[in-house]
């Protein structure tokens, strides 16, 4: 098995099985496009376990993903896909960049979920782009754009209901998708507190990476508490 790719939070390896990859979650945490970064023991284990639980939950709701199975505390097997160079962001409540960009007050609840596309390009700092930009960049056609939005909203609905049952609010999240060899679009990458904003209903306590971004406590304790809440659903 050879290393195919190493990113900020994960390593991806080939396997002996055609079309199957091994993902290893690293004990690294970054914020601000890597401007802030640390090695934190145990972080990879938590993100792997959280992502595995969430992807299994989404599977029960008919959401197709690249996830196959968790194989160890820090590893999982996934289907090989060609990642679509978009971060698809779904917002239920205003927080983060949209409060600065459009002036919404933090905590403002949107009447309907908002879906945004960001172009995955480090040199350009992952800019917000429109549907027309997506087509001009030959990232996806009209049919695929519609499918990405539909899947994103289906994922949002399933996650909102899941978190609501444990007294949490899904503020926003970002996801990635990939294409299989036959052109099917699957949910890919991860869904974890690294990629979501999650607030406790009664206190607005964060269960996400904002704890690290804003130096407001232990990311390990925060993620472990969130994992414990998810495991209680099983």
Curated annotation (Swiss-Prot):
Enzyme's top EC category: ligase
Recorded catalytic activity of this chain's protein: 5-amino-1-(5-phospho-D-ribosyl)imidazole-4-carboxylate + L-aspartate + ATP = (2S)-2-[5-amino-1-(5-phospho-beta-D-ribosyl)imidazole-4-carboxamido]succinate + ADP + phosphate + 2 H(+)
Stored Pfam families: SAICAR_synt
Keyword Secreted applies: no
Entry-linked CDD domains: SAICAR_synt_PurC (cd01415)
Phosphoprotein in keyword set: no
Pathway: Purine metabolism; IMP biosynthesis via de novo pathway; 5-amino-1-(5-phospho-D-ribosyl)imidazole-4-carboxamide from 5-amino-1-(5-phospho-D-ribosyl)imidazole-4-carboxylate: step 1/2
Keywords assigned: ATP-binding, Ligase, Nucleotide-binding, Purine biosynthesis
Gene Ontology biological process terms from the UniProt entry: 'de novo' IMP biosynthetic process; cobalamin biosynthetic process
Molecular-function GO terms, alphabetical: ATP binding; phosphoribosylaminoimidazolesuccinocarboxamide synthase activity
EC nos: 6.3.2.6
SUPFAM superfamilies assigned: SAICAR synthase-like (SSF56104)
Superkingdom field: Bacteria
Family of this protein: Belongs to the SAICAR synthetase family.
HAMAP family linked to this entry: SAICAR_synth
Protein name: Phosphoribosylaminoimidazole-succinocarboxamide synthase
Gene: purC
């Amino acid at each position: 098995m050879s290393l195919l790719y190493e990113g900020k939070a994960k390593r991806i390896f080939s396997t002996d099985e055609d079309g199957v990859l091994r993902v290893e979650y690293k004990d690294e945490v970054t914020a601000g496009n890597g401007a802030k970064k640390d090695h934190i023991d145990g972080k990879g284990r938590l993100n792997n376990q959280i992502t595995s639980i969430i992807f299994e939950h989404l599977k029960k709701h008919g959401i197709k993903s690249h996830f196959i199975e968790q194989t160890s505390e820090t590893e999982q097997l996934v289907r090989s896909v060609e990642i679509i160079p978009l971060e698809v962001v779904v917002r239920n409540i205003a927080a983060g960049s949209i409060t600065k960009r459009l002036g919404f007050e933090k905590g403002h609840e949107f009447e309907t979920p908002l879906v945004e596309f960001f172009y995955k390009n480090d040199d350009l700092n992952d800019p917000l782009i429109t549907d027309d930009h997506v087509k001009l960049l030959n990232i996806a056609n009209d049919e695929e754009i519609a499918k990405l939005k539909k899947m994103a909203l289906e994922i949002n609905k399933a996650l909102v209901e899941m978190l609501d049952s444990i007294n949490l609010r899904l503020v926003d999240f970002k996801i990635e998708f990939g294409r299989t060899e036959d052109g099917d679009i699957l949910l890919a990458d991860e869904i974890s507190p690294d990629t979501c904003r999650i607030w406790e209903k009664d206190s607005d306590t964060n269960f996400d990476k904002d704890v690290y971004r804003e130096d407001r406590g232990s990311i390990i304790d925060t993620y472990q508490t969130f994992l414990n809440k998810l495991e209680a659903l099983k």
